[in-house]
From Swiss-Prot:
GO function term, MF aspect, one: water channel activity
Listed name of the protein: Aquaporin Z
Domains as described in the record: Aquaporins contain two tandem repeats each containing three membrane-spanning domains and a pore-forming loop with the signature motif Asn-Pro-Ala (NPA).
Residue numbers marked as site, Selectivity filter: F42, H173, T182, R188
Alphabetical list of HAMAP family matching this protein: Aquaporin_Z
Main location per the UniProt record: membrane
Membrane topology: Multi-pass membrane protein
Quaternary structure note: Homotetramer.
Described function: Channel that permits osmotically driven movement of water in both directions. It is involved in the osmoregulation and in the maintenance of cell turgor during volume expansion in rapidly growing cells. It mediates rapid entry or exit of water in response to abrupt changes in osmolarity.
Similarity section: Belongs to the MIP/aquaporin (TC 1.A.8) family.
Source organism of this protein record: Vibrio vulnificus (strain CMCP6)
Amino acid sequence: MNKYLAELFGTFWLVLGGCGSAVLAAAFPDVGIGLLGVSLAFGLTVLTMAFAIGHISGCHLNPAVTIGLWAGGRFEAKEIVPYILAQVIGGVIAGGVLYTIASGQMGFDATSSGFASNGYGEHSPGGYSLTSALVTEVVMTMMFLLVILGATDQRAPQGFAPIAIGLCLTLIHLISIPVTNTSVNPARSTGVALYVGDWATAQLWLFWVAPILGALLGAVAYKLISGSNKD
């Protein structure tokens, strides 16, 4: 049970810290943190939680990561469903806390503001198409899993995995926020989309399918380049 609670709290922190920075601080007058700040916030949530709960649950915080680690031979199949449930619950609770905070500002409307939801077409920050969004999410998640599997390999330098993984997630956001608002994480997408409803839930399917496909490809890619299916 401890590891499931760890995943719940960890994903809560990722969604609250990452999406919270986007909703509350990104465009704050005069001192808004912007795209760079939001990207760093997402990376920092993973970095801090990796040190906090990595020894308890492995600090997946992401259904795609859980599935990718299973595909890479690093995780048991029987744990996939409870891990994903814990992650989604943590993300949804964080979305609720963030919604409560954001609602305290006069004129706030989750649907029109987007509430840090992921989207494509007219709901892409840069107006990118469904195809662009699909390719972006698949490739970004593939590379994320490649870094995770490599950084946590027993042959890799020890103790640096949280830094490599956190910086990788930061870089992913720097690249892809303009395209999809960056998901690479179905729990992150679900955690805020449910409070927007409308277009956000209608487009949510992509942000489950693409990251999971990307994670599977990342696991295959790492097996190809690592020369071993084992740690």
